[in-house]
């Protein structure tokens, strides 16, 4: 039991979107009140792990001062309530392809959401996916292709078999989350460093190769690990036909949003109230 608690306390230490140069982690602001001011727009929700509400996880939460344990994990009960809210209130939930189509046509009118998951650990197929399937809600899963089936900082990644099964659902979109560039050096995401153009291009090629071999398709959307943008990678992906690039820069998608810089909101229990309030104010897609 103590081993499980230790894993839960430390499993989220790699998940952060902003760093300062001296290596000290800068705390991201997930409040969002000041951002949700647009009358029309699409918010892209970002989830990482959806955990069952157990004695072990509750104890880990109560003793941990690691804010990332609270900010990057959502309890299953809370997640189900959030998805049920979207369904019962007839909030339009778009696929990532529908979002990109609206951007291209400048047809972002009213309000809607897109649901995304990063990394794709076991909690998606085991906990979150059954709820999404039951409620008939679309989502996009961003996959670290080189880490599928492995354990990363205490999180057991989903297998290709699990990913493929979800991908067979027409409501599910599979996207790229790099092949093996989801890590940090000196508290800085590797894509934020002076990593060479050759390295990022080769990594992207490996991701696309894995998609072709395992899912029999080409990835059309991409999400930056930690939200760390890289111009060399962006240019290369756009030339290769990537249709949408997602960041972790908070904001609302409007007709002015570039499909190469699509903002997302990391969902927490605390900021969900703000998100709900915005969605229930004027207009829907």
Q: Which residues are covered by each model-predicted region?
A:
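Functionally critical loop-and-helix segments that line ligand-binding/catalytic clefts
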Residues: 272-278
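Glycine-rich, phosphate-binding/catalytic loops in enzymes
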Residues: 62, 131-134, 240
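Metal-dependent polysaccharide deacetylase catalytic core of the NodB/CE4 family, i.e.
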Residues: 45-52, 110-113, 121-123, 130-230, ...
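C-terminal domain-boundary segment and adjacent tail
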Residues: 71-105, 212, 234, 238-272, ...
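Hydrophobic membrane-insertion alpha-helices, especially the h-region
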Residues: 1-11
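Short, solvent-exposed loop/turn elements at domain surfaces
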Residues: 52-57, 125, 271-272
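N-terminal pre-catalytic segment of deacetylase/amide-hydrolase enzymes
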Residues: 10-111, 285
């Amino acid at each position: 039991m103590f081993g499980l608690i230790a894993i839960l306390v430390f499993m989220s230490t790699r998940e952060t979107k902003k760093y300062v140069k001296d290596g000290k982690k800068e705390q991201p602001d997930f409040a969002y009140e000041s951002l949700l001011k647009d009358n029309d727009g699409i918010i892209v929700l970002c989830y990482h792990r959806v955990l069952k509400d157990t004695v072990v996880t509750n104890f880990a939460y109560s003793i941990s001062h690691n804010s990332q344990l609270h900010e990057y994990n959502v309890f299953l009960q809370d997640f189900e309530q959030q998805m049920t809210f979207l369904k019962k209130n007839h909030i339009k939930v778009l696929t990532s392809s529908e979002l990109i189509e609206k951007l291209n046509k400048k047809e972002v009118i009213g309000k809607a959401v897109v649901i995304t998951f990063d990394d794709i650990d076991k909690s998606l197929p085991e906990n979150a996916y059954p709820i999404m399937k039951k409620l008939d809600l679309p989502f996009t899963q961003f996959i670290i292709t080189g880490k599928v089936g492995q354990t990363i900082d205490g999180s057991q990644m989903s297998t290709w078999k699990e990913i493929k099964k979800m991908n067979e659902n027409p409501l599910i979109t599979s996207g790229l989350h790099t092949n093996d560039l989801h890590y940090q050096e000196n508290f800085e995401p590797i894509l934020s460093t002076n990593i060479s153009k050759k390295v990022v291009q080769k990594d992207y090629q490996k991701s696309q190769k894995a998609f072709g071999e395992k899912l029999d398709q080409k990835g059309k959307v991409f999400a930056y690990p930690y939200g760390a943008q890289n111009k060399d990678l962006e240019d290369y992906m756009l030339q290769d036909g990537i249709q949408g690039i997602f960041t972790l820069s908070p904001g609302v998608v409007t007709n002015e949003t570039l499909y190469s810089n699509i903002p997302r909101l990391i969902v927490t229990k605390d900021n969900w109230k703000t998100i709900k309030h915005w969605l229930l104010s004027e207009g829907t897609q």
